Design a protein with these regions (language model features):
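Conserved ATP-binding subdomain of kinase catalytic cores across diverse folds
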Residues: 1-24, 28
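Middle-to-C-terminal accessory/interaction subdomains
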Residues: 21, 26-214
Length: 214
């Protein structure tokens, strides 16, 4: 993915999974960047510049925006399906993947942004258990900076009014749904979910678009 999209040799890339740890290269650079950001107060005058120097902030915010907007149920634990990469001496970038559990009604009553900042799960007894990770801690810490928080809000608003706008979203869905029907059907055969079908999937997306339109 990185070689094909960024023309960077994989031997020169550090890849870290929030769940599995180091996947390629060295863990040192991520540890250093994470500790430096987390040990710096968001109120520090140089905090925003520090974050910009270590993280591709456009990629960072777009990643969290799309994950929270589509309510990815296979990501919300704060640890799952999260990978970041960095070419040597460059900024860290997030990779968006495994989003097939998105647009779930199970998350309709949850503030997705708050959940991403402070993820939790419920015990068998119904008690709330902290499920934060480096991923969620970093996101929360960065949003505690007013300048970066405003940047995030403005970017979220921009995307909601453009590519996430219901009319645009519906147009794109209608343009591809028949092309990808064989792939989606095969996906549900390989990973069955309570007899969930292609038609159910389309209806789920249509309902979600309508809900956002309201």
């Amino acid at each position: 993915y990185i070689e094909n999209n960024y023309s960077i040799n994989s031997e020169n890339v550090n890849i870290v999974s929030m769940r599995k740890g180091l996947m390629n290269g060295s863990y040192t650079y991520f540890n250093e960047a994470f500790k430096l950001i987390m040990n710096t107060s968001p109120n520090d005058a140089d905090f925003s510049d520090l974050v910009h120097s270590k993280i591709n902030i456009d990629n960072f915010f777009d990643y969290f925006i799309i994950q929270t907007y589509i309510q990815n149920g296979d990501w919300f634990a704060g640890r799952n399906n999260t990978k970041i990469w960095q070419a040597e001496s460059s900024k860290w970038n997030y990779v968006l993947y495994d989003t097939d559990q998105s647009y779930s009604s199970n998350f309709d009553s949850i503030n997705a942004i708050s959940f991403a900042r402070s993820p939790y799960k419920l015990s068998a007894e119904g008690d709330t258990i902290d499920y934060s990770s480096r991923n969620s801690k970093l996101f929360n810490h960065i949003l505690n900076n007013n300048q970066l928080k405003c940047f995030f809000i403005n970017r979220y608003t921009e995307l909601i009014n453009t590519i996430f706008h219901p009319s645009f979203f519906k147009e794109k869905l209608d343009s591809i749904k028949f092309k990808i029907e064989p792939i989606i059907t095969d996906h549900f055969l390989r990973f069955p979910l309570d007899n969930f079908s292609y038609d159910d999937w389309i209806k789920n997306l249509d309902d979600y678009i309508q809900l956002n339109n309201e």
